[in-house]
Each structure stands twice: as C-alpha cells, then as structure tokens.
Curated annotation (Swiss-Prot):
Belongs to the peptidase A8 family. It comes from the Bacteria. This is Lipoprotein signal peptidase. GO terms for molecular function: aspartic-type endopeptidase activity. It is a multi-pass membrane protein. GO terms for cellular component: plasma membrane. Its EC number is 3.4.23.36. InterPro entries: Peptidase_A8. It is an enzyme of class 3 (hydrolase).
Length: 176
C-alpha cells in the first residue's frame, strides 16, 4: 500500500472532479434551455431530449413510489466511499483501475446530486435508429459505464507488467 496519498490512486481524483463538473454543467444547461420532453435533433441518429429519470439505469424502479431515491442515494455514497478507499490503497501507476474507479465515483456523485436536488436524474442524450430509441442518459451515466467496462477489462487483462512483477516477488518469497 502506498505510504502517502500522492503515491496512491487518489492522485487520479481530478477525474472525479472533471466528470462531476462536466455532468453538472451539461445538466444545468439542459434545465435552463429545454422544457421537459423537448427534443432537438442534432444528427440523423442523435437528439438532445430532456427527460427525468426517477429510477436507475434504463429507468429501473422509476415507478416504485419514491423510496428508490434513498436506495440509490445509499448505493452512490457506499460505492463512492468503497472506491475511494480502494484508490487510497492502489499505487498511482495502476492507471486502468484508478481511471475506472474515478469515472464511477464522478458519475455516481453527479447523479447523486441530481437525486438530492431535484428528486430525479436529468437525462438528455438520446440515440436512436429509425423509430427505436435507446434509453436517454447523461454524462454521469456514460462515465459509470466506461468505468465499469474498464474494471471488467482489467479483470481479464490487468497490467501485465505488474502481474509479472508480483509473480517474481512471489517466486522470490517462496525460495527464501
């Protein structure tokens, strides 16, 4: 474990701040410039469409009656805390996991602020093909998904250099 925060994954916390600010600024822009369900076509497959999401990803539990706000608040705080602890224990050089954790934290905190401030999450990125629309989402959702993807990727490939060093250290310890 790194002896100080400067040598740990906490040095990557600037990503949390960047994701959080980009998410909140973009949502504030949507709230200022769009009416609910207003849509502006930008590309043949992409709209800005202001929608409110009272649930989680893909509007999961959006019709649950309000208790889900507190469940998702607890989950966001818990995951952000756990990932921050893990960042503190990781060396700075483990870039893939540090980036992944900070993307997830930034996204979780961005959506957490929406839930606490509005009671819902502001979504506006609307991709579609012909008449089939993917669930609208936001920058925080994107960061969470990219972070989760990096965690999954790292579980398969990891940092080969670090794994080989750990393997050599294990072999040296076994010889002694």
């Amino acid at each position: 474990m790194p002896t100080n925060w400067k040598d740990s994954g906490l040095r990557w916390y600037w990503v949390v701040v960047l994701v959080f600010i980009a998410d909140q600024v973009s949502k504030q822009w949507v709230l200022t410039n769009f009416e609910l369900h207003e849509s502006v076509n930008l590309l043949p497959f992409f709209n800005f469409t202001y929608v409110r999401n009272y649930g989680a990803a893909f509007s999961f539990l959006s019709d649950a009656g309000g208790w889900q706000k507190w469940l998702f608040t607890f989950i966001a705080v818990a995951f952000s805390t756990i990932l921050t602890i893990w960042l503190r224990k990781q060396p700075t050089k483990v870039w893939r996991l540090n980036l992944a954790y900070t993307l997830v934290i930034g996204g979780a905190l961005g959506n957490l602020i929406d839930r606490l401030q509005h009671g819902y999450v502001v979504d506006f990125l609307d991709f579609f093909w012909n008449t089939s629309h993917f669930a609208a989402f936001n920058i925080a959702d994107s960061a969470i998904c990219i972070g989760a993807g990096l965690i999954i990727l790292d579980s398969f490939i990891g940092d080969d250099k670090e794994k080989s060093q750990n393997g050599q250290n294990d072999n040296n310890a076994a010889k002694e």
